[in-house]
């Protein structure tokens, strides 16, 4: 509470400043009104020129906002209110603008997006789902295109070429997951041409609380298949029903964890025929057991997932939508598949990962909008250094929030809900009902059918018509049953949403705001005017009936989600009403103090169908929600603390990759690598005693696997001068450097000038990627078991940092060692490549061999133990270029390796948060957009489609 007050200390001054900015913009309105369309459009070029000449965006703000407001008025027929000007200015200043539902956040976003696009560095507008990204890019994009800016949208099914084009636009709309995955894919790319993003300048996050708070518990992960037997999942799915809750294992529903008791462990050990489940060799079995029990107790069919066509399909617990192609992580999905007896699909290995917190902290400037941010102001400030500015409403709030009604049973609660809906419908008042699952929404729908109440159901099974249903949810007599967050981002306007109804009418006529822009814009005003008259007449009737009635059938674990549901009513000063119906069987009530309330109701002999309203119940609910919010915040803080370790390492690797991709000359870096590796070899061999104690044969055997050694150890020992460690190192280093100079002359002579520099680039990139993937796997494994350190009175986070640091440096040493070995030993030749019409040409190809050569095996062993030199006997020839790992490209005539084949594309999976914090995993087929490549034919088709689209514009 104290922190919240401190954070709001300067709020009044900032609001005064924002009001002054809005007043200044209003003073410019008459001048802007007098401009023709062409003159208004020319203002954009003028602003760009002035900014290039040194004028700051802050100085341009009043004029740019005035121009953008007029652009919106001419294209959309909507003029920004003063509070929207204030909200836009707050966003430009890098703040979170808290604007209530219906205050026009989407329109507000146009102002700072337009202003910051003038800098020419790209503005990213982040939304919660693909539908909203496309809608806003089409809808608000009309304003930007009218003013001469380009607008792009990132969709999940786009090719890399389409993504690159969208990012090249002045303003790009997309979801947080797509922006984050593109960043990760860019850092897996093999050439700059494969990268799609162009930096991180300014991001405006719509529904910022949802994206930066709720979804921040789940990191973004790109993974590929890992070898894993499905036998153990089936085995533990067989064993789980044998164990009884509270006897063999305990379940903590609040933390969503399970713990096996001694009796449970004994049963498992007997069934598996093992002596100790917790000994090191059996550690993986504990994970299978925990997942099997979680699948049994915490993941319910038709609530958390459904089984369709032999597949387990996740249902988003917050929106009720089916999440096709998405999978739970860490073996959880496989455990559920085993439980349901369907095909068990392979687990994955992490290839790249980042948390949303660290992704959004890449931006030079970050801002956000939401209707409910004040409760999380401290976290926004602590994690993102973002202040929260409550923007006043355009008109006073007139919604009546009724007290909660608590029933003893769920059946009685839903009967009361159905009766309330029937009563409101009979008088014509529109009703929006919020449920927590598909199952409950369908149960309520059946009750309404029995009562003869016509209604629309908005859940996972019917989400295709989501926008249309929500747009009409404010019409007279409308009854809409929706899962909690469905339709977020679409205003429920009394009488109907004019813009959506007009857009639907024009689309019925075959017109699209992008493909048929001119015809669409020409017909828009007349259609809007016609629909506006009809809507306004109906809206007046609805206002007299009391406005939109929002009815919640259960409290959410977060107060913000409850407030978001309530916020659908009472927009722009309209009347409205809200009420929550609860039962003692609700999940939140069960998790906290429901037994106490039930005891009171039983003592008072309260019938099942009679609700209670009491301060004690209200306090219990508020206390429960506060506890869950605190738990979730701790989880997010913990995720961030652990990812900070990875973030430092990721920055080093990604910066190095970028330098390699941008063509930095690696000659000096490679020379340092040679010196470091040779020095490590010599130091390891000469650590003890004097020259007569050193194992020269072992050292020379190792050095020969690294490079062609020309100096003899016998000659050094037999020389007149005493052989010291320093002299030995000096001689070997001189020999290695001479060998590398000879190697460079050989490669350049065989292929052409500069070939060695290109070989260095490809080898370093290849080894870097493979070592980073291996390191991610090791770090995942470390994190899984690090919690056990607490039992030894050690801080798991401190241990994770320390061991992660050691592992990272070991990985860098192994990277140097393998890179040097490849550069000396890889076979190259000059030859014309075979025609490859489906593959782009790039300077060098590097691909993974099916079986590692002895040299490669020895390199891997040496990397595993830094203190010892363990090298295999050298072969007569080094590995072919085709044996370098990680290639994704075809070699040109300049430089090729023997036996080079085009590598197969890897099937990737993308794991990230759902709209409200659940976990989703999307699978892609090999060769689809996610791997960052496309065939030449696909690129040509995409280019033709883009050219046609541009021509129509």
Curated annotation (Swiss-Prot):
Which stretches are tagged as biased composition: Low complexity?
A: 841-865
Question: What GO terms fall under cellular component here?
Answer: cell envelope Sec protein transport complex; cytosol; plasma membrane
- Function of the molecule: Part of the Sec protein translocase complex. Interacts with the SecYEG preprotein conducting channel. Has a central role in coupling the hydrolysis of ATP to the transfer of proteins into and across the cell membrane, serving as an ATP-driven molecular motor driving the stepwise translocation of polypeptide chains across the membrane.
Protein name, as recorded: Protein translocase subunit SecA
Q: Which residues cross the membrane?
A: none
Q: Which GO terms describe its molecular function?
A: ATP binding; protein-exporting ATPase activity
Question: What's its top-level EC category?
Answer: translocase
Q: Where in the cell is it found?
A: Cell membrane; Cytoplasm
A GO BP entry is: protein import
Task: Give me the reactions it catalyses.
Answer: ATP + H2O + cellular proteinSide 1 = ADP + phosphate + cellular proteinSide 2
User: Which residue ranges have biased composition labelled Basic and acidic residues?
Assistant: 898-907, 940-953
> What disulfide bonds does the UniProt entry report for this chain?
none
| Major subcellular site | membrane
- What binding partners and quaternary form does the record give? Monomer and homodimer. Part of the essential Sec protein translocation apparatus which comprises SecA, SecYEG and auxiliary proteins SecDF. Other proteins may also be involved.
Positions binding ATP in this chain are: 84, 102-106, 491
Q: Where is the composition biased (Polar residues)?
A: 908-934
Enzyme Commission number(s) from the entry:
7.4.2.8
Q: What gene name does this entry carry?
A: secA
Q: How does it sit in the membrane?
A: Peripheral membrane protein
InterPro entries recorded = Helicase_ATP-bd, Helicase_C-like, P-loop_NTPase, SecA, SecA_CS, SecA_DEAD, SecA_motor_DEAD, SecA_preprotein_X-link_dom
What is stated as this protein's family in its record?
Belongs to the SecA family.
Q: Give UniProt keywords alphabetically.
A: ATP-binding, Cell membrane, Cytoplasm, Membrane, Nucleotide-binding, Protein transport, Translocase, Translocation, Transport
Locate the region Disordered: 832-953
């Amino acid at each position: 509470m104290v922190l919240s007050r401190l954070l709001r200390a300067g709020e009044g001054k900032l609001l005064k400043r924002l009001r002054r900015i809005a007043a200044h913009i209003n003073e410019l309105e008459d001048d802007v009104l007098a401009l023709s369309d062409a003159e208004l459009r020319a203002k954009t070029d003028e602003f760009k020129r002035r900014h290039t000449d040194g004028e700051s965006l802050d100085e341009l703000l009043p004029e740019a906002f005035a121009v953008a407001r007029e652009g919106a008025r001419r294209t959309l027929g909507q003029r920004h209110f003063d509070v929207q000007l204030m909200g836009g200015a707050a966003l430009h200043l890098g703040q979170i603008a808290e604007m209530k539902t219906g205050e026009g956040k989407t329109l507000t976003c146009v102002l700072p997006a337009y202003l910051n696009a003038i800098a020419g560095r790209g503005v990213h507008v982040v939304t919660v789902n693909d539908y909203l990204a496309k809608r806003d890019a089409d809808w608000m994009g009309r304003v930007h295109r009218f003013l001469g800016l380009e607008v792009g949208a990132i969709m999940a099914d786009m090719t890399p070429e389409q993504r690159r084009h969208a990012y090249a636009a002045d303003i790009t709309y997309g979801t947080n997951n797509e922006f984050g995955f593109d960043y990760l894919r860019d850092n897996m790319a093999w050439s700059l041409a494969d990268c799609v993003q162009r930096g991180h300048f300014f991001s405006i996050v719509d529904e910022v609380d949802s994206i930066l708070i709720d979804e921040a518990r789940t990191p973004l992960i790109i993974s590929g298949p890992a070898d894993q037997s499905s036998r153990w999942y089936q085995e533990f799915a067989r064993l789980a029903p044998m164990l009884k809750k509270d006897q063999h294992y305990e379940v903590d529903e609040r933390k969503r964890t399970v713990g096996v008791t001694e009796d449970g462990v004994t049963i498992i050990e007997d069934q598996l025929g093992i002596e100790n489940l917790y000994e090191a060799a059996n550690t993986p079995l504990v994970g299978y057991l925990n997942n099997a029990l979680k699948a049994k107790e915490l993941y319910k069919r038709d609530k958390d997932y459904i089984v369709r066509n032999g597949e387990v399909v996740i249902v988003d617990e917050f929106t009720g939508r089916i999440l096709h192609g998405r999978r739970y992580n860490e073996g959880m999905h496989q455990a559920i598949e085993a439980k349901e007896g369907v095909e068990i699909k392979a687990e994955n290995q992490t290839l790249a990962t980042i948390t949303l917190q660290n992704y959004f902290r890449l931006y030079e400037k970050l801002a956000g909008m939401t209707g409910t941010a004040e409760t999380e102001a401290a976290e926004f400030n602590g994690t993102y250094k973002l202040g929260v500015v409550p923007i006043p409403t355009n008109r006073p709030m007139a919604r009546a929030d009724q007290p909660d009604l608590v029933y003893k049973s769920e059946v009685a609660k839903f009967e009361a809900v159905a009766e309330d809906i029937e009563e409101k419908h009979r008088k014509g008042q529109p009703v929006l009902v919020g449920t927590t699952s598909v199952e409950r929404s369908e149960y309520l729908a059946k009750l309404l059918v029995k009562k003869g109440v016509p209604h629309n159901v908005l859940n996972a099974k019917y989400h295709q018509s989501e926008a249309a249903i929500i747009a009409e949810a404010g019409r007279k007599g409308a009854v809409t049953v929706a899962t909690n967050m469905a339709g977020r981002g679409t205003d429920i306007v009394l009488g109907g949403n004019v813009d959506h109804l007009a857009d639907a009418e024009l689309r019925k006529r075959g017109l699209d705001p992008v493909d048929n822009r001119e015809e669409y814009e020409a017909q828009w005003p007349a259609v809007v005017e016609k629909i506006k008259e009809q809507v306004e007449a109906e809206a007046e009737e609805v206002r007299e009936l009391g406005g939109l009635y929002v009815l919640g059938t259960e409290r959410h674990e977060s107060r913000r989600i409850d407030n978001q549901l309530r916020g659908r009513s009472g927009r722009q000063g309209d009347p409205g009403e809200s009420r929550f119906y609860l039962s003692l069987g609700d999940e939140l009530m069960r998790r906290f103090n429901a037994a106490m309330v039930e005891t009171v109701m039983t003592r008072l002999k309260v019938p099942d169908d009679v609700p209670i309203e009491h301060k004690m119940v209200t306090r219990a609910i508020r206390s429960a929600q506060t506890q869950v919010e605190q738990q979730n915040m701790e989880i997010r803080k913990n995720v961030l603390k652990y990812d900070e370790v990875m973030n430092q390492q990721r920055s080093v690797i990604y910066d190095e990759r970028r330098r390699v991709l941008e063509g930095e000359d690696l000659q000096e870096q490679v020379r340092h690598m040679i010196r470091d590796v040779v020095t490590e070899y010599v130091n390891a061999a000469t650590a003890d005693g004097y020259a007569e104690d050193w194992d020269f044969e072992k050292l020379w055997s190792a050095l020969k696997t690294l490079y062609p050694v020309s100096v003899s150890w016998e000659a050094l020992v037999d020389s007149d001068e005493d052989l010291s460690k320093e002299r030995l190192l000096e001689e070997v280093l001189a020999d290695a450097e001479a060998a590398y100079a000879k190697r460079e002359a050989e490669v350049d002579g065989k292929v052409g000038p500069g070939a060695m520099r290109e070989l260095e680039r490809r080898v370093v990139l290849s080894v870097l990627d493979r070592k980073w993937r291996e390191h991610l796997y090791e770090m995942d494994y470390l994190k899984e078991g690090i919690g056990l350190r607490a039992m030894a009175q050690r801080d798991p986070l401190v241990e994770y940092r320390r061991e992660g640091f050691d592992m990272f440096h070991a990985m860098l040493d192994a990277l140097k060692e393998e890179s040097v070995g490849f550069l000396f030993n890889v076979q190259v030749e000059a030859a014309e490549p075979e025609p490859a019409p489906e593959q782009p040409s790039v300077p060098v190809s590097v691909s993974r061999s099916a079986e590692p050569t002895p040299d490669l095996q020895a390199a891997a062993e040496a990397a595993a133990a830094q203190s010892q030199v363990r090298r295999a006997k050298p072969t007569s020839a080094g590995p072919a270029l085709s044996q370098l790992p990680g290639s994704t490209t075809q070699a040109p005539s300049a430089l090729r390796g023997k036996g080079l084949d085009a590598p197969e594309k890897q099937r990737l999976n993308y794991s990230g948060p759902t709209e409200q914090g659940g976990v989703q995993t999307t699978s892609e087929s090999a060769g689809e957009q996610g791997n960052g490549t496309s065939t030449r034919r696909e690129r040509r088709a995409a280019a033709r489609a883009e050219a046609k689209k541009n021509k129509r514009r």
